[in-house]
Amino acid sequence: LGALGYDSSIEGYTGANWTVNVIKQAVGIGLDDGNDNFVGSQAVTREEAALYAFNMLNATMVEYDQQNTIVVGDITINTTSSRKDVSNTTDTDGNIGSRDRKMQFAERYFGDLSEHDGDSDAFERPSTTWKLKSKTIGTYADEADATYTSEVKVGEIYSDLGLSDGISKQDVTLYEDGFKTTYSAGDVVRGSRQKVGGDGALLDVYYDEDADTLTLVQVNTYVGKIAAARKATSTRDAYVTLDVSDSFTGPGGTYDTDDFSKDDIVYYTYSYKTGEKCVESMGLAEKVTGTMSTYTTEGSVTVAGTKYNANVKSANNIYNLATTVDRSKDVTVYLDSYGYALYVDADTSVEYAVVLNYTANAGDFNNTAKAELLFTDGTRKT
C-alpha cells in the first residue's frame, strides 16, 4: 500500500487496529483478487506474495493534495486534503487496462510492460496477453465465472451464475479442446436437466453480461504411456514422446519436459486450435493397486474397496478391459488429477493347456475329480 502512495498515518495504518484498516484497504482495491482465503494479518506464502505483487501492477496509485502542519502557540493543527488517484498523461496510459488517464503501478515503474485483453488461449478461453515491449511473455486465461470437472446440468449452470433470465442456445458457444463445436444442450434456463461437460473434463463457463452470451470451454484429459524420454541437446530442449496405442486415449504427440521417464503413465491435455495442435500439459497419473471387485457399463471400477468413476474419454476402454479381468489377480487403476479412472492395467492373458488325463473319482476323502494338464511352456499340473 505504501508503494502505491497510501500514507500510513493518514489512512490509520498505526495503532492497535492498524491491521483492520490495512485489510479493508487492500480488499477495497483488489490486492487480494485470486485468494479466496485472504487474511491479511498473517505471514504470506511465496505464492500469495507473488499474487499480491501481480495485483499491485494493475492497481491505481494515489496521492494527497496537501499535508500541512500549522503551529499556533501550544496548538498543532494538521490539515490534510482527501486522497485522489494519480493522473497519467504520458504515453504509458493504457498499457495496463484501458486509457483511463490514471496511473497504474506498472505504468509508472515498468513502462515497457503491457497487458492486452480480448485474446484467447490454446483452448479458446478468454485470455490476457502480457508483453515486454514487443516480446510476448505469455497468454493467460481469465478467471471463469463457473468451473466444473464432472458432467453438469444446464439448470445448475443457470443457478450458479445467478441468472434471472434464460439464455438462448443460439447465444451459447462451445469449444472442446480448442475446437469450436456444436452446442446441443438447449436453452440455458432454470431447471433444465440437459447436461454438458463430462467426468474428468474441465468445463470453464464465461458469462458476458453486456452481450448476455455464454462461452463454454471444455478441456478433456487423456492418458498415455511415455514411449521415449529424450535429454536436452544443444539444439533442442528435453522432451517425451507418447504411446497412445492399446487402451490409451487422445492423439498423443511430444511434449517438452524432463519430468518423466520411459513407461510412465501420464495424463495430458491437447489443443486442436489452429496454430496449436499439440500437447498443452502433462502430469504423472496417480495409481491404486488392488483386487477389482466390481465394474459397471459406464466404466466405473471398484479397486481395493474404493469405487472410481471413469474419465469420460476412457469409459469405453475401461469397461471393455474390465470384462476380461481375472478377479483373483490385482489390477492397477490410474487416475486423472480430478480422481477419475483413466486406465486400468491388468493381466488379461489366457493360459492354454491340454488335458492329459482326467479322473472323475480321485479316490481321496472327498472323491474329488482331477485332471492332469500340460501347459504351453512344457510344465504339467494336476
Where are the regions that the model predicts?
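Glycine-rich, acidic and aromatic/proline-enriched surface loops and short helix-turn segments
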Residues: 1-6, 22-28, 55
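...the same signal can extend to comparable exposed beta-sheet modules
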Residues: 11-15, 24, 35-39, 46-50, ...
